[in-house]
Amino acid sequence: MKTRLKQLYSYLLIVLFFALISACAAPKHHILETEKDYQEAFNRIYFQGHAQMEVPVNYGRIDLLTGDYAIEVERIDKFHEGIGQALHYAKETRRKPSLAVFITDPTEHELEKLKYVRKLCQSLGIKVWYINEELEKAHKKK
């Protein structure tokens, strides 16, 4: 009986070991949570990774810089700060001001806020991207 129990125990350990190895080797779906996550994903999808990231300027750091745009990446809740930073970075670099906003868990209220931000930025001459939308477009193309 003890021998049979030892064999069963050994078999169970081997199965658990291989299950653990398989779980670690399985591809992981990347979940976007932080501003940096959205910044990197937007650069990769929209600019094919060619935008410069975190470029220092006087009194700040540009999230993404292209030949045309100085881009501030920001949560929709912090759009006020994002607009100010976009204008500042555009002046520092002689590029067009732009704001790339994201929403981690879209609600009706936040989508209404996005509409407001788009209108406000249009009146200020700031290009706006909704990162969630751009990532969804890229996902549908695949």
Regions found by a protein language model. Name each.
Residues 2-12:
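Bacterial N-terminal signal peptides that target proteins for export
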